Structure formats: C-alpha cells, structure tokens
C-alpha cells in the first residue's frame, strides 16, 4: 500500500496508464487481425488498404512505448511480406 501522497498519486496514475495501454494493445491486435483476414480472403487491394491503416496503429503504439520499436517493425515487416507473397 502506498504510504506517501506521491506514491498514492503514482498508483492512481499507473492504473489509468495501464487501462490506456490495454486499449492500445487491443487496437493493435484488432488491426493485425483485419490485415490477416484480408490476406486469407485473397483480396490484395483490400489487404494493402487495411495494412496502411494498421501501420499507423502499430507506429503509434511503438512511439508511445507500449511495444518496443523492433517489435512494431517486425510485425509490419511480416504483414508486408505476406501481402507481397499474395498472387
């Protein structure tokens, strides 16, 4: 239990930030799933459009520090490779 006023405030702030980060991670997962769904459907044009939207989400999460920038780059690279591999 936080004893000082500063520690109590940091505990409150941490809870708020944890909830915000959770929503960002959820947005990331949703964006990736949309791209994968478009890839499975075989629609390359739609996959590109959805991928561009998901890139923004992934970059934003990396900038905020929720994910490491290398993890974000890895996800973008793998999704891009899957789109390029489509016939």
UniProtKB/Swiss-Prot annotation:
Where does it sit, as one GO cellular component term?
small ribosomal subunit
Q: Per its UniProt entry, which superkingdom is the organism in?
A: Bacteria
The residue ranges flagged as biased composition, category Basic residues, are 7-19
GO-annotated molecular function: small ribosomal subunit rRNA binding; structural constituent of ribosome
Matching Pfam families: Ribosomal_S20p
Keywords for this protein: Ribonucleoprotein, Ribosomal protein, RNA-binding, rRNA-binding
- Disordered: where is this region? 1-20
Tell me the Gene Ontology biological-process terms attached to this UniProt entry. Answer: translation
- The yes or no answer to whether the keyword Ribosomal protein is present is yes
Name the family the entry cites: Belongs to the bacterial ribosomal protein bS20 family.
Q: What does this protein do?
A: Binds directly to 16S ribosomal RNA.
**Name of the protein in question:** Small ribosomal subunit protein bS20
What species is this protein from? Chromobacterium violaceum (strain ATCC 12472 / DSM 30191 / JCM 1249 / CCUG 213 / NBRC 12614 / NCIMB 9131 / NCTC 9757 / MK)
């Amino acid at each position: 239990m936080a004893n000082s006023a500063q520690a109590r405030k940091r505990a409150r702030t941490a809870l708020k930030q944890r909830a915000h980060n959770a929503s960002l991670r959820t947005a990331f997962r949703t964006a990736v799933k949309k791209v994968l769904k478009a890839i499975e459907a075989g629609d390359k044009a739609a996959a590109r459009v959805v991928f561009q939207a998901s890139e923004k989400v992934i970059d934003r999460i990396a900038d905020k520090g929720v994910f490491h920038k290398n993890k974000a780059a890895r996800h973008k690279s793998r999704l891009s490779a899957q789109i390029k591999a489509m016939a």
